[in-house]
From Swiss-Prot:
EC number, UniProt record: 1.1.1.267
Cofactor(s) named in the record: Mg(2+); Mn(2+)
Species assigned in the record: Pectobacterium carotovorum subsp. carotovorum (strain PC1)
InterPro entries, per database record: DXP_reductoisomerase (IPR003821), DXP_reductoisomerase_C (IPR013644), DXP_reductoisomerase_N (IPR013512), DXPR_C (IPR026877), DXPR_C_sf (IPR036169), NAD(P)-bd_dom_sf (IPR036291)
Pathway: Isoprenoid biosynthesis; isopentenyl diphosphate biosynthesis via DXP pathway; isopentenyl diphosphate from 1-deoxy-D-xylulose 5-phosphate: step 1/6
Binding site for Mn(2+): 150, 152, 231
Positions of NADPH binding: 10-13, 36, 38, 124, 126, 215
Record function comment: Catalyzes the NADPH-dependent rearrangement and reduction of 1-deoxy-D-xylulose-5-phosphate (DXP) to 2-C-methyl-D-erythritol 4-phosphate (MEP).
Protein name according to UniProt: 1-deoxy-D-xylulose 5-phosphate reductoisomerase
The keyword Secreted appears for this protein: no
Residues bound to 1-deoxy-D-xylulose 5-phosphate: 125, 151-152, 186, 209, 222, 227-228, 231
Amino acid sequence: MKQLTILGSTGSIGVSSLAVIKANPDKFAVRALSAGYNVKLMLEQCLTFQPAYASMADEVSATALRQQLAEYGCKTEVLAGEQAACDLAALDGVDQVMAAIVGAAGLLPTLAAIHAGKQVLLANKESLVTCGRLFMDAVAQSGAQLLPIDSEHNAIFQSLPEQIQRQLGYASLSQNGVERIILTGSGGPFRETAVSALADMTPDQACAHPNWSMGRKISVDSATMMNKGLEYIEARWLFNASAEQMEVIIHPQSVIHSMVRYRDGSVLAQLGSPDMRTPIAHAMAYPERVTSGAKALDFCQIGALTFLAPDYARYPCLQLAIDACNQGQSATTALNAANEIAVAAFLQSQIRFTDIAAVNRHVIEQLTLPEPDSVDDVLYIDRWARQAATQILTHYAR
């Protein structure tokens, strides 16, 4: 029986993780849950899974949860704040930590799990986008094991030889016969929209992803393909890949989640229904296999799989991310932070869809900060980029 802490339990990955746990009650148990401000959903989760601990982002939410749990006679101990999330990530007796807190808020709790030597199921992109080298060094020093949750990275992981799986971030791709990692993306809801019409796209249109059910922020990132850009950066660190060993292609059906091309001409791919429960179940049970609850793939119903090269005029954020990755960790950190500010402004209808890339580009152009040597350095770059993006927003405000 594996004991888990779920960081970000009320988000879409957290909810899917709990669904997999519920489908396999003889294999997994919840020791601790951590979330932001969604008291209502956290209450339901605590009553269903009876964790020893739960944490909320602030004392107001924690107090509300505490009072409501007491009314039900639930014994879950409720904590508050970022340190509480870090403590729950490093709990004694916890085997696995699902790192699914979105954004820079997930950095320190994820790092706490790594330092504690846990098996870390990594769904927080920002950990590697902003702290790639720091995180991979910490993994090596602590003996922690990273298992990727993003459907693309999980697909790549499954398509790689075991020697690389066991030494993520350090094993040589070329020495293990790998020629190239092929990252696939659907192209989002605006794949066929005229580029001239993109400026008029609304938040609701951007969030209507054709294949995946996701949160609003990541849905917008899918529409701009910034999500694929962040995944590109993450894959470079996770699989120790050079720019020459990476390729991004559009695959509208989202059936092939990514591929690995080998020196002998073989290409290994992982296929499945677009359901996050599949990669979650794979990582939780690794190296075994368990029921995920995901629908089986019906090849006859799919009919055909198609592929396209990405159009960087349509997806300038993808190009920005690739360029930032080649520039360094300071640039990827700044880009990630600027993008969070720009997407939040777009979701509130303060700027146009095409302004997201413009704001991101301006922040990168203003960047003069050196490469980070610590998490504090990363957080400083993150704060600087957020302030710079907020200032730039005033020029685009509608």
